[in-house]
């Protein structure tokens, strides 16, 4: 079920009236659904733009069309038009399922480690242009990672590994006993902090 507030409906209705196209509605879709990059897209949709398999939600003065493939990702979504503390008004979309759901506790340790890396750790490392990839998870719970981007060759990679990544993985994934770095940092060509300046 998708909730669209009265304020958001009024906002959309005014925009559609300004366009002056008979039958125009708003189409909602999920972009890169099930990934950390997932986002919601809203766009005007004329009748000729519709494929016919969209879910139609009747609103006050227009129809909200949800792309069929996006429906599971948009379940529980809330669309609102809010006034921020600065006085500016902004359209907000909260779609709690759009990035996917964490694997169940019964999932393999590899699945749970990969989910935490992709959805919690890599978004933080991205602020420095970095990322990590899971190379291996051993039977005794040792996670082997390979750093990339700005983390490849970074002088602070050891600190990031021990104080950030290892603590996060050990706290979020039962059974993880250690996290090790498999990266040859000497080959990094664009580190966030060069190794010789981190000392």
From Swiss-Prot:
Coiled coil: none
Needed cofactors: [4Fe-4S] cluster
Gene3D superfamilies in the cross-refs: Fe-S cluster assembly (FSCA), HesB-like domain
Ligand binding ([4Fe-4S] cluster): 151, 154
Superkingdom, natural source: Bacteria
Gene Ontology biological-process annotations: iron-sulfur cluster assembly; protein maturation
Molecular function per GO: 4 iron, 4 sulfur cluster binding; iron ion binding
Entry keyword Iron: yes
One Pfam family cited in the UniProt record for this chain: NifU
UniProt remark on cofactor binding: Binds 1 [4Fe-4S] cluster per subunit. The cluster is presumably bound at the interface of two monomers.
Keywords: 4Fe-4S, Iron, Iron-sulfur, Metal-binding
Function: Involved in iron-sulfur cluster biogenesis. Binds a 4Fe-4S cluster, can transfer this cluster to apoproteins, and thereby intervenes in the maturation of Fe/S proteins. Could also act as a scaffold/chaperone for damaged Fe/S proteins.
HAMAP family xref list: Fe_S_biogen_NfuA (MF_01637)
Subunit: Homodimer.
Similarity section: Belongs to the NfuA family.
Record protein name field: Fe/S biogenesis protein NfuA
Species of provenance: Xanthomonas euvesicatoria pv. vesicatoria (strain 85-10) (Xanthomonas campestris pv. vesicatoria)
């Amino acid at each position: 079920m998708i909730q669209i507030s009265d304020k958001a409906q009024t906002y959309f209705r005014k925009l559609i009236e300004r366009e002056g196209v008979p039958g125009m509605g708003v189409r909602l879709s999920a972009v890169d659904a099930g990934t950390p990059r997932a986002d919601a897209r809203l766009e005007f949709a004329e009748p000729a733009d519709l494929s016919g398999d969209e879910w139609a939600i009747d609103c006050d003065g227009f129809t909200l069309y949800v792309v069929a493939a996006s429906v599971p990702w948009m379940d529980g979504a809330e669309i609102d038009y809010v006034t921020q503390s600065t006085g500016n008004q902004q359209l907000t979309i909260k779609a709690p399922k759009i990035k996917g759901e964490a694997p169940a506790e019964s999932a393999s340790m590899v699945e749970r480690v990969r989910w935490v890396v992709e959805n919690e750790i890599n978004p933080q490392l991205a602020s420095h242009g970095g990322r990590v990839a899971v190379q291996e998870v051993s039977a005794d719970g040792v996670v082997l990672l390979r750093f990339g981007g700005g983390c490849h060759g970074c002088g602070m990679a050891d600190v990031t590994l021990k104080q950030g990544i290892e603590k996060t993985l050990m706290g979020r994934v039962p059974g993880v006993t250690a996290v090790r770095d498999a990266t040859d940092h000497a080959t990094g060509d664009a580190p966030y902090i060069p190794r010789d300046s981190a000392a």
